[in-house]
Structure formats: C-alpha cells, structure tokens
Amino acid sequence: MRHYEIVFIVHPDQSEQVPAMIERYKGMVLAAEGKIHRLEDWGRRQLAYPIQKLHKAHYVLMNVECQAETLAEIEHAFKFNDAVLRHLTIKMDRAISDASPMMKDEKAKNLLDAQPAAEVEASA
C-alpha cells in the first residue's frame, strides 16, 4: 500500500457537515483495509484567491495508507460532492503522523493567547 496526503476544501456553508464527510472518507479507507496516520481539521480559513466568489473555506488534511483503487474512489467522491471546492492528493514516501505546521502554529497561537490571560489574572 502507498502513502498519500490529501487536503480538501469544503464550502463554508457546509462546515457543519464536515465531521460527517470526514467519517465517510475515513470509512472508505478503513473498509479497504487502509490506515489513517494523520487527520486534522484546520477549520475555516481565508483562501489565497476567491473560489466560486468565496473568500473563506473549511480545510481538512488526511494522511492515509491505502491502495490506488481506494484513492480513486475517494477522489471520485470528491468530484461528485458539490460541497468540496478543491482537493489535492500527494503521494508520500512514508507515513507522516506528526502535527502539520498549520496545527503547530495553532498550538503556538493558543499558548501565546493563554499566557497573557494567566498573567493578567495573577497580577489582579
């Protein structure tokens, strides 16, 4: 089986359906005896350029290990799902399970935001 990194962008009006989409695509991989090494929901983010007159979209990252047939099935599902604005699949040499730079940045921001609040409470 090969390793793939998949990023897909979902229409912002469909953000509440993202967990169901993730479960569906996860189920496709697991049903074909594949593995999911990393799954990250990056949330709603600004797009670099407008897509269908939209400036924000919901991002999801998956690192999977599966057969080419399973990947073709997932990409086919992306094409026929109107909520998926764009998708990108990259073949990887090995499984990647570390946090992505996007998530590392989020953790750093959260830590920086939480620290001043704690300092304010301590000084009060």
Curated annotation (Swiss-Prot):
One of its GO terms (cellular component) is cytosolic small ribosomal subunit. The keyword Ribonucleoprotein applies. GO terms for molecular function: small ribosomal subunit rRNA binding; structural constituent of ribosome. InterPro entries: Ribosomal_bS6, Ribosomal_bS6_sf, Ribosomal_S6_plastid/chlpt, Transl_elong_EF1B/ribsomal_bS6. GO terms for biological process: translation. Binds together with bS18 to 16S ribosomal RNA. Belongs to the bacterial ribosomal protein bS6 family. This is Small ribosomal subunit protein bS6. It comes from Chromobacterium violaceum (strain ATCC 12472 / DSM 30191 / JCM 1249 / CCUG 213 / NBRC 12614 / NCIMB 9131 / NCTC 9757 / MK).
